[in-house]
């Protein structure tokens, strides 16, 4: 997690894997799961090509379909699209998610990873 960057906490509901992580003027740059002892487990960001291999998409609306119940546990990666954050695997317990943000660049400027 970045020092000095805006951070937002989300209490995860077991079985819910979509989070509205919008913060006007900012983009998501990192996520971590916080356990009961307040230890942070960073999540790896994946690109669309890797996420599509794991999760089937609905042809009618283009949204990812809910994975089967068997595929639940401690999230290890996330996919960020628009203002929605998708966790993989689906959370099995009520952990806390910490999300780091960075300001968007000027309009039309390419986004850079730090």
Residue ranges and their predicted role:
Residues 1-114:
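Glycine-enriched, solvent-exposed interface loops adjoining structured elements
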């Amino acid at each position: 997690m970045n020092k000095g960057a805006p951070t937002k906490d989300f209490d995860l509901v077991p079985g819910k894997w979509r989070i509205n992580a919008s913060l006007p003027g900012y983009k998501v740059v990192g996520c971590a799961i916080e356990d009961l002892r307040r230890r942070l487990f960073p999540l790896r960001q994946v690109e669309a090509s890797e996420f599509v291999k794991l999760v089937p998409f609905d042809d009618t609306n283009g949204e990812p379909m809910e994975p089967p119940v068997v595929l639940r546990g401690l999230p290890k990666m996330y996919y960020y699209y628009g203002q929605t954050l998708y966790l993989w695997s689906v959370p099995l317990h009520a952990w806390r998610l910490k999300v780091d943000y960075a300001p968007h660049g000027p309009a039309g400027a390419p986004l850079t990873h730090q």
